[in-house]
């Protein structure tokens, strides 16, 4: 059973964007570790941040509503709009979410250390209206200035692109890749930074094509005035010593002699799973000739139980020299055109 983000924020499933913002503001103030000293506060603060990041983003919310937490984080929501798989991973830093929401400032420095002039404590302030109005802050935590940059105006940094090279064997069987990234994260004050390493786990599905994109939303560097960039990995095929790839087909080049091309031969054709398939070639091998072994290629991405084909191309080796008597025999028996 996945997390119920609506329950975490204390709202109904049909809540509006404004309801989500108000709920996050209330819960974030309630469970912020600078105020709430209970042992569970830090974990609740993190859950609230994750719930807000999902429900405040229309695409992530749509996927979550349809597939739940497992579908959102497992890539069940289809593509990212660029042909890649969309999957969400929470960045793990609720303080960065808090700082971005409240404009990169720390409102706790203002009112958590003392009671307000009107006599209300912080618990009352989170329940009643706008807790920051007395300090010149708007409801989203930004100064009341028409020229200020609020969350609705933040722009996301361009995606950070990485190539992810995989072998044909890995595409054939599927595999798991763990990629280490380093990024800057905002501290709780919303101004200073710290370096942070993170391991991103990528499930390579059977048959994925070169160019497939895997997107980790907002895993890039954090800054006070922009949304972190998405980290995007693009699948690239490694060169293979035996095979070339053609979509879901693979191509093997069999080297044979001129005599074998004319008189026939038997060859062993290797496969990606380590077997050898014997093949008899009785026809004359002509330029461009191919043979096909059905079902021995790569899995189809959308139907991995079915596979493409193994294509055999022939490369004929010609002798460097030939004797006069052999030439005479060839002239006698081979057609002139």
UniProtKB/Swiss-Prot annotation:
PROSITE patterns named among the record's database cross-references: DNAJ_1, DNAJ_2
Biological process according to GO: chaperone cofactor-dependent protein refolding; negative regulation of transcription by RNA polymerase II
Principal subcellular localization: cytoplasm
Assigned keywords, A-Z: Cell membrane, Chaperone, Cytoplasm, Membrane, Phosphoprotein
GO molecular function, one term: protein-folding chaperone binding
Top-level taxon in the UniProt lineage: Eukaryota
Residue ranges of domain J in the record: 2-70
SUPFAM superfamilies: Chaperone J-domain (SSF46565), HSP40/DnaJ peptide-binding domain (SSF49493)
CDD domains in alphabetical order: DnaJ (cd06257), DnaJ_C (cd10747)
Pfam families the record matches: DnaJ, DnaJ_C
Matches recorded under InterPro entries: DnaJ_C (IPR002939), DnaJ_domain (IPR001623), DnaJ_domain_CS (IPR018253), DnaJ_subfamily_B (IPR051339), HSP40/DnaJ_pept-bd (IPR008971), J_dom_sf (IPR036869)
Location within or outside the cell: Cytoplasm; Cell membrane; Cytoplasm, Myofibril, Sarcomere, Z line
One GO CC term on file: plasma membrane
Modification type Phosphoserine: residues: 122, 148
UniProt subunit comment: Homodimer. The C-terminal section interacts with the C-terminal tail of OPRM1. Also interacts with SDIM1.
General function of this protein: Probable chaperone. Stimulates ATP hydrolysis and the folding of unfolded proteins mediated by HSPA1A/B (in vitro).
Name of the protein this chain belongs to: DnaJ homolog subfamily B member 4
Organism expressing this protein natively: Pongo abelii (Sumatran orangutan)
Organism classification: Eukaryota, Metazoa, Chordata, Craniata, Vertebrata
Encoding gene (name): DNAJB4
